[in-house]
């Protein structure tokens, strides 16, 4: 079997295709979560905390060159080391939301699988088998 045909067999298996579809959907879903975090949740948190833009929350770890604007992008371009905790907070919130949603999906899937795997009611024993068991039991019983 040539390498190309082996690869074709591998690529056409259901698991690989399912994985590819999952990765594509996951990437698209990640963008939705990014939007929810950046456009809906972080502005509300920023409003409560008093800062509207978390991405510009940082601490300079060195003095900037004279005339450098005090924005994160300008300081990074000037080579000033900064501790950008605002961006980190946004990413942490993003991760927590994504992890929670995935947990809820897996939980629902597992419950659905458990429901499908519930044992069926035992089948009714056919009459001929019941009769044979009765005959067997009567033959085993002590005679008086």
UniProtKB/Swiss-Prot annotation:
It comes from the Bacteria. GO terms for molecular function: mechanosensitive monoatomic ion channel activity. Keywords: Cell inner membrane, Cell membrane, Ion channel, Ion transport, Membrane, Transmembrane, Transmembrane helix, Transport. One of its GO terms (cellular component) is plasma membrane. The chain crosses the membrane at residues 16-36, 86-106. It is a multi-pass membrane protein. Coiled coil: none annotated. SUPFAM superfamilies: Gated mechanosensitive channel. It is found in: Cell inner membrane. The keyword Signal does not apply. The keyword NAD does not apply. Its main location: membrane. Belongs to the MscL family. HAMAP family: MscL. Channel that opens in response to stretch forces in the membrane lipid bilayer. May participate in the regulation of osmotic pressure changes within the cell. Homopentamer. This is Large-conductance mechanosensitive channel. It comes from Cupriavidus metallidurans (strain ATCC 43123 / DSM 2839 / NBRC 102507 / CH34).
């Amino acid at each position: 079997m040539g390498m190309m045909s082996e690869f074709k067999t591998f690529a056409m298996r259901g698991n690989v295709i399912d994985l590819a579809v999952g990765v594509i959907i996951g990437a698209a879903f990640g963008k939705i979560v990014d939007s929810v975090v950046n456009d809906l949740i972080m502005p509300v948190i920023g409003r409560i905390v008093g800062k509207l833009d978390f991405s510009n929350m940082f601490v300079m770890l060195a003095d900037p060159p004279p005339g450098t604007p005090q924005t994160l992008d300008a300081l990074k371009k000037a080579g000033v080391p900064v501790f950008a905790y605002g961006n980190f907070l946004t990413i942490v919130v993003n991760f927590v939301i994504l992890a929670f949603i995935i947990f809820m999906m897996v939980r629902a899937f597992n419950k659905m699988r458990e429901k499908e795997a519930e044992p069926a009611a035992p089948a009714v024993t056919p009459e001929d088998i019941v009769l044979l068991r009765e005959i067997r039991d009567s033959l085993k019983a002590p005679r008086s």
